[in-house]
A protein has these predicted regions:
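Flexible "cap/lid" subdomain of the alpha/beta-hydrolase fold that forms the substrate-access gate
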Residues: 1-7, 11-189
């Protein structure tokens, strides 16, 4: 296949947004869910996230304390996955939210907001897979943000290919104006 339309969701959207910048001739178009195109910041994004969100923000935590989160997730894989794969969280009140919660706390707390977004049998599949493979590799994606930032220093950070951006009504990521960065953009919520 010489050319394709690339589709991404969440951190996969970050990969897809950069495809036309890195491999323009291979891209017919893009479709992304949840995460908008974010032009390269002037400083290392991990430093920027730490300044904006503090040391317990999950991406900062993965970079500043390698291995800690992965070990905590592995200690109780079922609890961790059950705590993060939730829906209807916005219906719950803030009084049930532990204060100062970090990503590591998601592996340790018993307070579960909202509803599990899958059956217990479906959760078993995820638990089994992560018990087999562990969490180090997924955490490594976030530890590569600084390196990706370095590697993209010489790129023009403007997407010229046709792009579709879809936000979920209850996404944590809110729509942003990408008109200066994405030339041919259609947005749906």
């Amino acid at each position: 296949i010489d050319q394709a339309v690339f589709v991404g969701h969440d951190w996969g959207a970050l990969v897809v947004w950069y495809q036309p910048l890195l491999n323009s001739d291979r891209v017919l178009g893009l479709a992304n869910f949840s995460v908008p195109f974010l032009p390269r910041p002037p400083i290392d994004p991990v430093v920027l996230m730490e300044q904006a969100n503090g040391p317990e923000f999950y991406i900062v935590h993965f970079n500043r304390q390698p291995g800690v989160a992965a070990a905590a997730f592995a200690d109780n894989t079922r609890r961790f996955l059950s705590n993060i794969y939730r829906t209807n969280v916005w219906h719950d009140t803030d009084e049930n939210q532990p204060s100062g919660m970090s990503i590591v706390d998601m592996a340790r707390i018993d307070v579960q907001r909202g509803d599990l977004m899958m059956s217990e049998e479906e959760l078993d599949v995820f638990v089994s897979a992560f018990q087999h493979s562990g969490f180090e590799a997924p955490c490594n994606w976030y530890r590569n943000f600084s390196r990706n930032w370095e590697l993209t220093s010489g790129l023009e950070h403007r997407v010229e290919h046709p792009a579709l951006m879809i936000y979920g009504r209850y996404d944590m990521v809110r729509p942003v104006d990408m008109s200066d960065s994405v030339a041919d953009l259609e947005i749906h919520t």
